């Protein structure tokens, strides 16, 4: 997770990857990995203000009509304060339903390059222990990551899919590129309720990558035409 003293992946990605490796060797887990994971977690600073947003939400604000589009618009506009308020309203109105995680994941995938790997691992980490009291922590995790860079506009879907990833994979130069490709492939094969939206954004990203690499106007792999 550290490359030249600079983190190249989110802690959720790192710990989920370690969990996956250890899951294959439960009878004799690697002491090196266990030690690394323990030291890594110990070096992280816990977020301390996650609950404050919920505590500060006025009760009359929860009773108002709740529209998912208000949360989506706030995220799109990059208004951090409004995003927190709308997310809290949706979360409280839905009684802590994890559905909000998929809503935010679809938005984050408008930037597959920056968020694809993180979103896959974040959803998987929650699914490993899908407890209601953990939903808000994961909501904050996604919101804080999305805040790092502006979201592009929602994209139009294309006919591209995992079968068109070959040329992109062959051009990978950094480990983060492999993480992204593996993540979007797994997301494509998932069964999330917002999967159509996930596929729309992923197909657009694949199309753009292949346009750059093979010059086809529609972004398709000529071997699959």
Describe the function of each predicted region.
Residues 1-225:
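Mature, well-folded catalytic/scaffold domains that follow N-terminal targeting or propeptide regions
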């Amino acid at each position: 997770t550290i490359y030249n003293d600079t983190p190249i992946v989110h802690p959720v990605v790192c710990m989920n990857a370690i969990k996956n490796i250890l899951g294959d060797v439960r009878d004799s887990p690697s002491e090196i990995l266990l030690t690394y994971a323990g030291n890594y977690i110990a070096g992280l600073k816990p977020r301390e203000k996650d609950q404050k947003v919920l505590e500060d939400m006025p009760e009359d604000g929860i009773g108002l009509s709740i529209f998912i589009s208000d949360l989506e618009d706030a995220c799109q506009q990059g208004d951090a304060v409004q995003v927190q308020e709308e997310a809290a309203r949706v979360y409280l109105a839905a009684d802590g339903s994890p559905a909000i995680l998929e809503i935010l994941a679809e938005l984050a995938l408008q930037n597959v390059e920056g968020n694809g790997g993180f979103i896959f691992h974040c959803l998987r980490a929650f699914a490993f222990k899908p407890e209601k009291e953990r939903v808000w922590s994961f909501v904050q995790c996604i919101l804080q990551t999305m805040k790092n860079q502006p979201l592009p506009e929602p994209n139009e879907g294309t006919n591209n899919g995992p079968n068109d990833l070959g040329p992109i994979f062959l051009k990978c130069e950094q480990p983060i590129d492999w993480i992204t490709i593996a993540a979007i492939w797994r997301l494509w094969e998932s069964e999330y309720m917002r999967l159509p939206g996930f596929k729309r954004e992923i197909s657009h990203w694949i199309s753009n990558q292949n346009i750059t690499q093979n010059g086809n106007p529609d972004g398709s792999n000529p071997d699959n035409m």
